[in-house]
Design a protein with these regions (language model features):
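One-carbon transfer enzymes
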Residues: 1-240
């Protein structure tokens, strides 16, 4: 709701033309519609249930994404923003909006393996980073492609230091407390940076400061990297 309630750029730099939920309901539907923004319910679980298929069936996912395209096209969006959408995006959406789908991921997508794949992809990225011994975590807004969290980074958050208590918890084998800390750390990131970071990415895109068609990002070449300070108070972001 940051983009609706707090972002000064909405209706100035960008406009929200519709909201689509993959859930059964949309908790903020009334608030959104009061602002004149249509809300569309497109339940992914119901869609799969009518086809008697598991959520892992990517052929059905392609059908679902094709219906998503049909739902949003009448609103002529220039960009799709995924917010809490935890499913792989398939070809119908990628083809309809090439390099025009953005997502927020809770790890530093500049951290790459030698083959260019992200070190911490997926929904358990914060847990995996903490387990790997990282001393800080970051969030990244990135372009979406067919591979999970492998699209070009757009903007990166400030660092969130990992508590030194984690090492003590690990030494004591206090797995339950460590799980609780990991959850709290991710909530800290979500509540602090989610809305402002997405807004920063939208501002950069709307002002033409991001080359959305630089689709051949490999994760190896960082010569184009630019650090920008001051986009938000007391925060530093890396724009790619």
């Amino acid at each position: 709701m940051y983009l609706l309630n707090q972002c000064p750029d909405r209706a100035v730099t960008y406009e929200i033309v519709c909201c689509v939920t993959s859930g059964e309901t949309f908790a903020e539907e009334v608030r959104v519609e009061r602002r004149g923004i249509p809300t569309l319910v497109h339940s992914i679980r119901r869609f799969y249930a009518t086809r008697n298929a598991p959520l892992t069936d990517l052929r059905v996912r392609a059908e679902y994404d094709a219906e998503t395209v049909a739902l949003v096209e009448p609103y002529f969006p220039d960009l799709l923003l995924l917010d809490g959408y935890l499913y792989l995006v398939r070809e119908p959406l990628l083809r309809a909006f090439p390099n025009r789908i953005v997502n927020l991921h809770f790890s530093d997508l500049m951290l790459r393996h030698n083959d260019g794949t992200p070190m911490f992809p997926g929904v358990r990225a914060v847990r995996d980073a903490i387990r790997a011994g990282c001393h800080e975590t970051r969030a990244t807004v990135h372009l979406v492609n067919a591979e999970p969290d492998r699209g070009m980074p757009i903007v990166r958050s400030r660092s969130f230091p990992v508590s030194p208590l984690v090492e003590e918890l690990r030494a004591r084998q206090a797995a339950d407390v460590l799980r609780a800390y990991t959850f709290a750390h991710q909530e800290w990131m979500i509540r602090t940076v989610s809305g402002p970071l997405i807004a920063s990415a939208l501002r950069l895109i709307a002002n033409g400061l991001v080359d959305l068609d630089a689709a051949n990002f490999s994760g190896h070449d960082t010569s184009w990297r630019l650090e920008i300070d001051g986009l938000l108070p007391e925060r530093s972001y890396a724009v790619h």
